[in-house]
């Protein structure tokens, strides 16, 4: 199975996902703007386990959120061995859907490492981070705030 596939038109309402991961490691404001996505995902996938990969220093922002089941802490200055351990953990989780909502090279590597059958990224992604994604959330420009943009899920 290839890590990098062609983009497919996918209706997320037709997916029966059991394990979902949000990859949005930083920054404070971006994490806060992503929080409204959790109830949307929970409503759409009521029986799924929802995880969030986030920098350890920001994990307290989401800890205890009622729609979140698991926090995967990321050590920003981790050694190569720490990075490998993180990628191994992401692969072992066997996610059905992964959302790369950061759109950077490091989050693309994390997204690809999951080998999830459905990987969703941002049309505005940089550094080639769209490559491991099957579906891209459209660019809505600055007219639509980030937290509303994610509702397109």
How would you label these PLM feature ranges?
Residues 1-153:
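Catalytic machinery of carbohydrate-active enzymes
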């Amino acid at each position: 199975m290839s890590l990098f596939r062609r983009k497919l038109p996918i209706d997320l309402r037709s997916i029966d996902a059991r394990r979902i991961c949000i990859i949005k490691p930083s920054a404070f404001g971006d994490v806060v703007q992503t929080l409204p996505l959790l109830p949307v995902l929970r409503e759409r996938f009521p029986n799924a386990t929802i995880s969030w990969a986030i920098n350890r220093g920001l994990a307290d922002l989401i800890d205890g959120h009622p729609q979140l089941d698991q926090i995967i802490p990321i050590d920003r200055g981790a050694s190569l061995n720490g990075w490998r351990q993180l990628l191994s953990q992401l692969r072992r989780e066997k996610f059905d859907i992964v959302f790369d909502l950061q759109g950077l090279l490091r989050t693309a590597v994390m997204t690809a490492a999951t080998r999830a059958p459905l990987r969703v990224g941002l049309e505005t992604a940089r550094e080639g981070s769209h490559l491991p994604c099957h579906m891209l959330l459209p660019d809505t420009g600055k007219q639509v705030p980030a937290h509303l943009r994610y509702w397109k899920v």
